[in-house]
């Protein structure tokens, strides 16, 4: 059996309206790349990146969901096993911000109770086209007791910081396992397919 190259696996989810830049945020973090020609995500896709936090190698499995309503049934089935969820809106699109309340309700309905949440106001490099003041993002984050960052995938503002902060918040809540424990507990999301068991 191949030796595990990581200590912990965290499943993260990106949600928000179509066109807010979720895929760009993910690619900036996973590949340090920005592409202006992405087509809308169909259904769901994911990337993996391993980071080191507090001396532990943590594999981040980051799922990028489609924002369109027609994919709602597919994407909400992925909420259940998520340990961290990033809600993304576009600071140049007021409707995408208004819909954050809908996305928060989706989390309440479909995700685990103890899931870590974070709000991202994306495209902050386009300040001249801003329609959502930063204070509004801060206010909704305060009301829901979640962290908030304004980000730009294009010029790489706060992308890595947001992902690492979310991972650190999850790590803080993760029980420490015995170092000699070889078994992967699939009921706690310990393996790549482990989180699926929570859908049952």
Swiss-Prot record:
It comes from the Eukaryota. Its cofactor is Mg(2+). A motif (Switch 2) lies at residues 64-81. It is a lipid-anchor. CDD domains: Rab8_Rab10_Rab13_like. Its main location: membrane. Switch 1, switch 2 and the interswitch regions are characteristic of Rab GTPases and mediate the interactions with Rab downstream effectors. The switch regions undergo conformational changes upon nucleotide binding which drives interaction with specific sets of effector proteins, with most effectors only binding to GTP-bound Rab. This is Ras-related protein Rab-10. It comes from Canis lupus familiaris.
């Amino acid at each position: 059996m191949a030796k595990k190259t990581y200590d912990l696996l965290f499943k993260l989810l990106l949600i928000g309206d179509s066109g807010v830049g979720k895929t760009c945020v993910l690619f900036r973090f996973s590949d340090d790349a920005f592409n202006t020609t992405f087509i809308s995500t169909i259904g769901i896709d994911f990337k993996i990146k391993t980071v080191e936090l507090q001396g532990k190698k943590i594999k981040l499995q980051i799922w990028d969901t489609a924002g369109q309503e027609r994919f709602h049934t597919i994407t909400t089935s992925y909420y259940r096993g998520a340990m961290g969820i990033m809600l993304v809106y576009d600071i140049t699109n007021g409707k995408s911000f208004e819909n954050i309340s809908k996305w928060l309700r989706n989390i309440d309905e479909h995700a685990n109770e103890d899931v870590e949440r974070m709000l991202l106001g994306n495209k902050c490099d386009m300040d001249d086209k801003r329609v959502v003041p930063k204070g509004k993002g801060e206010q909704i984050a305060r009301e829901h007791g979640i962290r908030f960052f304004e980000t730009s995938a294009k010029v790489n503002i706060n992308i890595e910081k947001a992902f690492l902060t979310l991972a650190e918040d999850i790590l803080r809540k993760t029980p420490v396992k015995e170092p000699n424990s070889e078994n992967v507990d699939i009921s706690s999301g310990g393996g790549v397919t482990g989180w699926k068991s929570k859908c049952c």
